[in-house]
Amino acid sequence: MKAIRFISILLILATVCCPLVACDQGDATDIDLPERDFYEVTVSFQIKDKTGRTVIEAIDYKYKSHAEPTVLNVVDTYLAVVQDWVCKIDKTNTLTQIGGMKANKNNGEYWGFVTNIETDSEGNLALNGKTAINLSLEQINRNLSDGKMCDAKVIDGAEFTLILKGTE
């Protein structure tokens, strides 16, 4: 009788425990994770001053992005390149802020979209100070003076436009 009870207990334990022990699926390194898709994005754009003169132009600039190539994502990703060019081209030590550039991201700061890029009465590149997060000119200049973008100063001005020709 004791033997039958012992065998019954063993069978119950085997039924419960064996799947747990035998269910080895291998290491985590064996799991095939799908690679993230990249989107090939092509952008052409011009930055013109208020007279219509093209100041900066890029034709068929190509890059890869994880984000879908909407105009918003294109502007957002593209900004650092444009900013770099503006800092090099603008000899008057003023700055043109264009679109959603991410500056000093590790400290949680984010530069929202600027609506009007402008030139002042002397033709210097300038900005009306309007951003999506309402940074004041003083705040922007304070961040710029730390060398996070380039040596530049934002001033008030007239009219400057960014034209995105589209994405593929």
Task: Tell me what each language-model feature is.
Residues 23-168:
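Ubiquitin-like/PB1-type beta-grasp interaction modules and other compact soluble beta-rich domains
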Residues 18-22:
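C-terminal motif of bacterial Sec signal peptides marking the signal peptidase cleavage site
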